[in-house]
From Swiss-Prot:
Pfam families linked: TACO1_YebC_N, Transcrip_reg
GO cellular component, one term: cytosol
GO molecular function, one term: DNA binding
Annotated protein name in UniProt: Probable transcriptional regulatory protein BLi00754/BL02339
Signal peptide segment: none
Tagged with keyword Transcription: yes
Family, per entry: Belongs to the TACO1 family. YeeN subfamily.
Stored SUPFAM superfamilies: YebC-like
Highest taxon, organism lineage: Bacteria
Keyword field contains Transcription regulation: yes
Amino acid sequence: MGRKWNNIKEKKASKDANTSRIYAKFGREIYVAAKQGEPDPELNQNLKFVLERAKTYNVPKAIIERAIEKAKGGSEENYDELRYEGFGPNGAMVIVDALTNNVNRTAADVRSTFGKNGGNMGVSGSVAYMFDPTAVIGFEGKTADETLELLMEADIDVRDILEEDDAVIVYAEPDQFHAVQEALQNAGITEFTVAELTMLAQNDVALPEDARAQFEKLIDALEDLEDVQQVYHNVDLGA
């Protein structure tokens, strides 16, 4: 799973480089989570998860509070959660998750972006079956063995625990996200380098240099779309 962590690192690095964009996306995601449930994260697991993710991207408190207050204020702005699947150069697989208040606009934007960058949209299910929904939690201050021991003591099973670049990365089932994080917090871990619910490719692929350059342009263009929240793919960008 080391290569999978490479992809997450590359993704975080690219997003960290464009803070205004990522803050805007988090503001929307926090608003939607708070509006769909309680505005209190202790009573709303979806909101709690989004806030934990936001911490790893250093989203300012003011943006978080503004989004929650907007939801509390009874804003009538509604968003649909959408998933698109498609292919990039050399048949590389791509999943795009979006939050939108205009489904037709978003579908057209995503389709156009695929087409302009050597890819094409697929039908629902054409790609997702090659990915596994996965909770990924990364932190420093423990070894993989110590992490395994404390999770076993908490009676939590996970898929894998790896040490990568001075950090420990835990891969778990999505419904174990909060249990894993709480067990780690109880063991003294307070800062997380990554806290994601992601779609991990079952098999990564390497692309030739020219195709890889075009693929990276496709991913960047998709992530630049206002309505797109997450982009997942099966290309090893850490090679």
